[in-house]
Regions:
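Carboxylate- and glycine-rich phosphate/diphosphate-binding segment that chelates Mg2+/Mn2+
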Residues: 1-62
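Phenylalanine-focused residue identity feature
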Residues: 5, 65, 105-108
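Catalytic-loop motifs flanking and including active-site residues across diverse enzymes
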Residues: 17, 21, 66, 85-89
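A general alpha-helix detector
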Residues: 24-28, 51, 69-73, 89, ...
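Gly/Pro-rich interdomain helix-loop hinge
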Residues: 74-125
Length: 125
């Protein structure tokens, strides 16, 4: 998500691929919540992880992984796992970014979470 919310915000293929990867993660996590041994869902998550880490999603984007750097310190101090630490830090970052980036967050709501924009402002999305 840090790459997705990085600049530039205009449409580019990296953002489109990133949205597809995030939708796949959401879909397959939902499957695994009820069927933890589902091979297809696990393999799709592995593929999504590879896509997220191989650099293709960063092409054309300015990336900032300060949340990850902060989490490494938090994890070292508290011994929490990396994902749990990021789950605490990211919402704070996104609340900070939202006022100047409502269009990007609206796109995220629509294209990743499938939220219908009808009757909603960008900020409401």
């Amino acid at each position: 998500m840090e790459t997705y919310f990085g600049k530039p915000d205009e449409n580019n293929l990296s953002d489109d691929i990133n949205e597809a990867v995030m939708r796949s993660v959401i879909c397959n996590i939902r499957v695994l919540l009820t069927d933890k041994d589902n091979y297809e869902a696990r393999s799709e998550l592995a593929w999504a992880s590879a896509m997220a880490e191989n650099g293709i999603l960063k092409i054309g984007k300015v990336t900032d992984f300060q949340c990850h750097m902060i989490e490494h310190q938090l994890g070292a101090y508290t011994n929490c796992n990396h994902g749990a630490g990021l789950a605490v830090i990211h919402p704070v970052l996104y609340r900070h970014l939202l006022p100047a980036n409502t269009a990007r967050f609206a796109r995220f709501a629509q294209n990743v979470w499938g939220i219908d924009p009808a009757g909603k402002s960008e900020l409401k999305l």
